[in-house]
Amino acid sequence: MVNISEIPDDSNDGCDPNKKPEEQVLRRSRRIATRNENQNKKPKEEEEEDNRSVSFPIPNELTEACVALIRKCDYPSLSSVSSYFFNLIASSGLYETRSRLGLSETFLYAAIKFPDTNPANWYILHRNKVSSLRLTEVGSLPPVPWGCSVVTVGQEMYVIGGLLDIRRLQLMTLIDCRTHKCRSLPSMKRGRYKAAAGVVDGKIYVIGGFRMRKPDAEWIEVFDLKTQIWESLPGPYPRTSAGSQFSAHAVMEDKLYMLGSKFCLVYEPKRNGEWDASVGATPLKDLWDKTCCVVDDMLYTTDPRRTLGHPIVVYHPKDKTWRPVKGESLWSLPSYFFSKSEMANFGGKLVILGSNKSYVTGDCIGEKGIWCVMIELEKREGGEIWGKVESLDCVLGDINFLSVRLCQTLTI
């Protein structure tokens, strides 16, 4: 079961987003992570008192099954009742039960930057009480560093590197999307900005993120999710990797694809770290735009120039070709909607967040702000893929030139 859940507004953290100086990002991230860790730790006496204050005459399994039926938007309030409920809601067993009952929900997290503020902040897409889609700030999470890389594993997001002033960050932060708590993880050996990152076989591979690649063994670092240890991987590296900041990256068929300024690279961890040299002879870079996502091991991206006659195209890694995503309703979307937007896989559908105001002409259709388009995909005979606009909503309105930095989805 895939839907967008109604959730309460979590934006009141006592901070005015217009007054967050960029130089406080690192400090605030660490402070929030430390605060979240401290909140999870209770004195032994207090924990015992909490456990004594709530008595359950029914088995734990039945309690878990009952809680699984409750909307996830009510979990934050329920977790504050006692340590029992806090631990239950943070447990993996509860979400396995929700999945087994067909109650899992897909959530979209977006990094939104306001015109006069730095950096971006986390927002979550939800449906309000009148069934309209809205973006609501998640105030308990730290700001999003510019140029960071984000990967999702289960119900967690890993925020890697980024830029603070002119300094490349070595940090990696774990965000638990079940509880909106975060904590710091071991740092990388090198600071990275606009690095490529992907998860293959329980390991996070982080590649590049430097101005220029130096002849050392730290161009690729790997984080083992079990041991929580970083490891540097030696070369050889492809000659085309001199410029190592990537505007987009994706994982398809357990291979990490990277879009550079001049070349595309493909790294294969399962083949002893081999590089697919044949990708240089394919049209991959011709149409790959930073607004992209992967659905069923195929790369979808926007094409504002409509090279193949349609605004969205899809790359098939097996035959290494681009094909159009057909559909009359896609033509109703203005071309400038795709120019500064982000795309995500929302339970097999495409979600695109973007501005409905042209940065060039100032043209605007409808309410100014961030708009969300939901596109249903259909595979037809002959391998053709068709798209149908399922909904188009203004999700964060009445503000000019909002910027969507990234968006991620995960199922909880």
UniProtKB/Swiss-Prot annotation:
Residues 16-26 have a biased composition (Basic and acidic residues). Pfam families: Kelch_FKB95. Residues 1-55 are annotated as: Disordered. Disulfide bonds: none annotated. InterPro entries: F-box/kelch-repeat_ARATH, Kelch-typ_b-propeller, Kelch_1. Kelch repeats lie at residues 156-202, 203-250, 255-291, 292-345. The keyword Nucleotide-binding does not apply. This is Kelch repeat-containing protein At1g19470. It comes from Arabidopsis thaliana.
